[in-house]
């Protein structure tokens, strides 16, 4: 869950988000080291009186500044590719949910159940209850079982949208005429908030997403009550 004046990422709720957080820290460390080295070299150049205006080539230096950046790029690319494969892979999903973006609300369909589908609109500010979040609450939350792989099929009825839940490491474009796939897995129960992350019109800011992750038993009771 985000909080005011937050500088870092939201707490990871899924294995994918944990990997993304580690990759962020890994890349940031490399960027920090490179920036420190460059600033150190610049400070030396500005403070020293020694110059080498007659130097035309330096084979050793050129070799170093060719091989070193290549090695750094490999160190960044390898964990990135690993995470990409993890995000794309889903074997035997326990549940499939189809998500459709509209101007300006979301609709959900549980394809493993008959007639289990609903629309999800933002709750107006004047209807919020104490403790609820402005511009983030919805009238119908999407309820999913925790600790199980869930396949989300995401598309759009009209314009480009993007279904995004930061704490789960999810951001998948909803494109008209195209079906995109995302994997949802939560390590713990709770409410997780997201929003449409693609500018889709005048009410783009009013398309929140609320996932309620619950134990499997509670999900079965909820789905039975909805059918």
From Swiss-Prot:
Q: Where in the cell is it found?
A: Mitochondrion inner membrane
Q: Which domain of life is it from?
A: Eukaryota
Residue positions where Phosphotyrosine is found in the record: 218
Claim: Membrane is one of the keywords in the record: yes
Q: Detail the disulphide connectivity of this chain as listed in its UniProt entry.
A: none
Q: Which cofactor does it need?
A: Cu cation
Q: Which residues cross the membrane?
A: 15-45, 60-87
Question: Cofactor: bound how, per the entry note?
Answer: Binds a dinuclear copper A center per subunit.
Stated membrane topology is: Multi-pass membrane protein
Q: What is its EC number?
A: 7.1.1.9
Q: Which residues bind Cu cation A1?
A: 161, 196, 200, 207
Q: What is its main location?
A: mitochondrion
Which InterPro entries does its entry note? Answer: CcO_II, CcO_II-like_C, CcO_II_C, Copper_CuA, Cupredoxin, Cyt_c_oxidase_su2, Cyt_c_oxidase_su2_TM_dom, Cyt_c_oxidase_su2_TM_sf
BP-aspect Gene Ontology terms: ATP synthesis coupled electron transport
One molecular function GO term is: copper ion binding
Purpose:
Component of the cytochrome c oxidase, the last enzyme in the mitochondrial electron transport chain which drives oxidative phosphorylation. The respiratory chain contains 3 multisubunit complexes succinate dehydrogenase (complex II, CII), ubiquinol-cytochrome c oxidoreductase (cytochrome b-c1 complex, complex III, CIII) and cytochrome c oxidase (complex IV, CIV), that cooperate to transfer electrons derived from NADH and succinate to molecular oxygen, creating an electrochemical gradient over the inner membrane that drives transmembrane transport and the ATP synthase.
Q: Which family does it belong to?
A: Belongs to the cytochrome c oxidase subunit 2 family.
Subunit organization: Component of the cytochrome c oxidase (complex IV, CIV), a multisubunit enzyme composed of 14 subunits. The complex is composed of a catalytic core of 3 subunits MT-CO1, MT-CO2 and MT-CO3, encoded in the mitochondrial DNA, and 11 supernumerary subunits COX4I, COX5A, COX5B, COX6A, COX6B, COX6C, COX7A, COX7B, COX7C, COX8 and NDUFA4, which are encoded in the nuclear genome.
Q: What is this protein called?
A: Cytochrome c oxidase subunit 2
Q: What organism does this protein naturally occur in?
A: Rhabdomys pumilio
